């Protein structure tokens, strides 16, 4: 007698199930059985779509990285509107949302996953952080070109500070409430204060 339910879009439903397990139980609880149990499907479904569990995790990470790239487009589109600090505050809350923050420990602690990600794409070993870095760097360069931050602002250093500090702000416990706009906004404002103060005219 068959076990589980039929999945119409099996890959996406397995990804969704994995994200729920990560958010509820943390990265140590993420196993192939936990994913298929959460999805309510037979245990063999995952292995019909992926060579092994690490192959599943690679596609899960790359799917999340692609979503971050989409959000990055919205950040770049905001250049020249609102405030630089406000745009970056919103972006950090999105780029380091609960799911990306739950996935990052998988990349950090699973050597095989990291190795496969490197093979799958350049810089893939640090997927998600790499996409966040690219997004923020491109946005800051756009704002510098528009004269909203100093012409000699060191975009690379600002980006590293924002990504590194933003990551730490959201790392404490990704299953708990996020640090909230005030804390993130205060951090962002402090990082970019000099570059904004010295902007042209």
Enumerate the predicted regions with their spans.
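Basic, helix-initiating cap at the start of DNA-binding domains
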Residues: 1-38, 54-58, 79
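Helix-loop "lid/cap" segments that line or gate small-molecule binding pockets
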Residues: 77, 89-100, 106-116, 189-196
């Amino acid at each position: 007698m068959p076990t589980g339910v039929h999945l119409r879009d099996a890959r996406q439903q397995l990804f969704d199930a994995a994200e729920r397990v990560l958010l509820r139980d943390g990265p140590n609880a993420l196993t192939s059985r936990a994913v298929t149990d959460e999805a309510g499907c037979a245990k063999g479904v995952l292995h019909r779509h992926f060579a092994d569990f690490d192959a599943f995790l690679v596609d899960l990470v790359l799917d999340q990285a692609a979503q971050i790239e989409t959000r990055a487009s919205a950040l770049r589109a905001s250049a020249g509107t609102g405030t630089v600090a406000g745009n970056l505050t919103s972006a950090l809350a999105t780029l380091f949302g609960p799911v990306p923050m739950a996935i990052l420990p998988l990349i950090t602690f699973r050597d095989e996953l990291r190795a496969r990600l490197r093979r799958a794409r350049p810089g893939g070993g640090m997927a998600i952080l790499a996409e966040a870095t690219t997004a923020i760097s491109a946005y800051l360069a756009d704002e510098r070109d528009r004269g909203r931050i100093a012409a000699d602002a060191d975009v690379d250093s600002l980006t590293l500070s924002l990504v590194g500090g933003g990551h730490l702000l959201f790392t404490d416990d990704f299953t708990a409430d996020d640090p909230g706009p005030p804390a993130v906004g205060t951090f962002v404002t402090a990082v970019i204060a000099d570059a904004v103060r010295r902007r042209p005219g």
